[in-house]
């Protein structure tokens, strides 16, 4: 049964962390994080961009319920989503950076294509 990754966090903390990562990705265009967090974030971010492509009021409200900053939502609907009108999915890429010095966790850069 496919589901989501637990990421070693309780549910509320995991949801909060993923909301922050998605907001940062849409705000800055790229983020640096661990590989498993990036894979989980990518899934959610792609859904947000697909909602942005729809462009109606309901989609905007759905994104607003997840993304924390209104300016990021406005930017998503006005600038980011129109770039991907011809593309069906695959809005992000993961670039491996190497292991983290402290614990050896695989660090990657997650960026919008």
UniProtKB/Swiss-Prot annotation:
One of its GO terms (biological process) is translation. Coiled coil: none annotated. InterPro entries: Ribosomal_bL17 (IPR000456), Ribosomal_bL17_CS (IPR047859), Ribosomal_bL17_sf (IPR036373). The keyword Ribonucleoprotein applies. Gene3D superfamilies: Ribosomal protein L17. PROSITE patterns: RIBOSOMAL_L17. One of its GO terms (cellular component) is cytosolic large ribosomal subunit. One of its GO terms (molecular function) is structural constituent of ribosome. It comes from the Bacteria. Keywords: Ribonucleoprotein, Ribosomal protein. Belongs to the bacterial ribosomal protein bL17 family. Part of the 50S ribosomal subunit. Contacts protein L32. This is Large ribosomal subunit protein bL17. It comes from Clostridium beijerinckii (strain ATCC 51743 / NCIMB 8052) (Clostridium acetobutylicum).
């Amino acid at each position: 049964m496919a589901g989501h990754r637990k990421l070693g966090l309780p549910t509320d903390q995991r949801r909060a962390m993923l909301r922050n990562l998605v907001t940062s990705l849409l705000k800055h265009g790229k983020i640096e994080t661990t590989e498993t967090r990036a894979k989980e974030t990518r899934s959610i971010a792609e859904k947000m961009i697909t909602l942005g492509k729809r462009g109606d009021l309901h989609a905007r409200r759905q994104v607003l319920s997840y993304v924390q900053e209104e300016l990021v939502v406005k930017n998503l609907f006005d600038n980011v989503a129109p770039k991907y009108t011809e593309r069906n999915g695959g809005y992000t890429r993961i670039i491996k950076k190497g292991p983290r010095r402290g614990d050896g966790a695989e660090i990657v850069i997650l960026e919008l294509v």
